[in-house]
Design a protein with these regions (language model features):
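Glycine/proline-enriched, intrinsically flexible loops and inter-domain linkers
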Residues: 2-123, 131-150, 154-162
Length: 162
């Protein structure tokens, strides 16, 4: 039996076939992605930025624990925040329920493919998702997904799954 990543002729329909992201995402050209990077970052600056991103993600999870009011989030830590690149590759995911991280990128890739053209992805948008055919582990897990824009370009994604 082939691995799911090797199946190329099955189309996502949400009934019999789940969403499997293609190697190259079909993103609307109307959505501008931030593609610049700096190859000359010195090791100290790199470590400062890396640790700041980790701490931002940690604080994201701690905030969810404090404000959720859910014993499942507060004590079982059944949640996971993530930071992803503009095209849904992982930067960081929290030290909580790791299986939730494994599906977050799939959900964001689906949004990029199926929402970038119509209705479009804009600054200030928030996406709420819980479809296990697309990216949620099961329907009880709900993802809140926020695109982050810088100077009119999609810079990254901030997500949490609870």
């Amino acid at each position: 039996m082939p691995r799911i990543s090797q199946i190329t002729d099955v189309a996502f329909d949400g009934i019999d076939n789940p969403y499997v992201p293609p190697k190259t995402l079909n993103i609307s050209p109307s959505l501008k992605l931030h593609r610049d990077w700096d190859e000359t970052v010195d090791p100290v600056t790199y470590e400062v930025i890396r640790h700041n991103l980790w701490n931002i993600n940690e604080e994201h999870g701690a905030t969810i624990q404090r404000i959720s009011g859910s014993p499942v989030a507060m004590f079982a830590l059944d949640l996971n925040p993530s930071i992803l690149t503009e095209d849904a590759e992982f930067v960081y995911f929290g030290p909580y329920m790791q299986y939730m991280s494994g599906v977050t990128d799939t959900q964001v890739k689906w949004i990029l493919e199926y929402r970038s053209g119509n209705p479009g992805i804009k600054a200030g948008d928030m996406f709420l998702a819980n479809d296990p055919w697309v990216g949620a582990a099961h329907q009880m897990d709900v993802m809140l997904i926020c695109p982050v824009f810088h100077e009119g370009e999609l810079f990254c994604w901030i997500t949490n799954c609870l």
